């Protein structure tokens, strides 16, 4: 994703319920249509909003125009590297054995996940090249010392969008 002005990010902020999710999904669908080989896009949102992202994509877009992968819950469990396949020296610390399988994104062009999942699997997410990252309810990453903020900053992403329906300080 390149811009004429070499901007690396944007903020999309307005009141709740005015269509930010739809606007971002439309942008993603446009980017995929324009460049089918584009790197996947990452959407990080609170757990309470993940289903909204899925519902909006199903409601307004054909399944093939926005191939989605939800990296949360049961779907996330199927993407994990089994603990017994990780070096025994790392197995002693549960925080060090949270990895996702190689090529875990598959054919998905949009990956939906939570802030907690991004934090817990930061190395696997950071190992993936992303064309776009959307942080929904971006106030979750305003504390620079927080682990979730650090995980978000480690992502290998070309363009970032902070999205919020909460007044920005």
Where are these regions (language model features)?
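ASCE P-loop NTPase motor core, strongest for the SF2 helicase catalytic module
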Residues: 1-169
């Amino acid at each position: 994703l390149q811009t004429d002005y070499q901007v690396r990010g944007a903020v999309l902020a307005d009141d709740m319920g005015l269509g930010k999710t739809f606007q971002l999904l439309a942008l993603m669908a446009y980017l995929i249509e324009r460049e089918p080989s584009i790197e996947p896009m990452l959407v990080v949102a609170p757990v309470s909003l993940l289903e909204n992202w899925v519902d909006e994509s199903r409601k307004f877009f054909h399944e093939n125009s926005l191939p989605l992968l939800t990296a949360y819950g049961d779907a996330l469990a199927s993407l994990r590297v089994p603990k017994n396949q990780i070096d025994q020296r790392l197995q002693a610390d549960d925080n060090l054995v949270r990895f996702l399988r190689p090529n875990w994104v598959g054919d998905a062009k949009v990956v939906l996940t939570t802030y907690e999942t991004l934090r817990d699997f930061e190395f696997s997410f950071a190992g993936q090249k992303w064309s776009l990252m959307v942080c929904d309810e971006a106030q979750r990453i305003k504390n620079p010392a927080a682990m979730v903020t650090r995980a978000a900053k480690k992502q290998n992403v070309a363009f970032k969008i902070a999205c919020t329906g909460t007044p920005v300080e």
